[in-house]
A protein has these predicted regions:
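Positively charged, low-complexity terminal tracts
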Residues: 1-103
């Protein structure tokens, strides 16, 4: 599925969210979470954990290089939603809706 994550987060009133005078973009925030791996849960084995980390890294690089529309597999879209779950509800909802085609 093709998804453009290079869009700004907006607040409850529809205004773009900025931090230190910089607009917060979904792709940048998602990439930061994927790169840090803070959303990952411990695997049953070291091999599983290593695979999760590598998958997150590769997805981070794919989104960062796209700087716009990116073609995601079902598994990659699921990982983006899992990573976005560490955001506040407003941020998560916007990422989720973008991927799932909601409002």
């Amino acid at each position: 599925m093709k998804v453009n994550l290079h869009v700004p987060f907006v607040n409850i009133f529809g205004k773009e969210i900025s931090h230190n005078s910089k607009i917060q973009m979904m792709d940048e925030e998602v990439c930061n979470i994927l790169f840090s791996g803070t959303f990952l849960r411990p695997g049953k084995t070291l091999e599983e954990e290593s695979k999760q980390k590598m998958d997150a890294y590769l997805l981070c690089m794919k989104i960062a290089k796209a700087a716009g529309e990116v073609d995601l597999t079902v598994e990659e879209a699921a990982m983006v939603k899992m990573a976005a779950a560490s955001l506040n509800p407003g941020g998560y909802g916007q990422v989720y809706n973008l991927i799932e085609g909601g409002e």
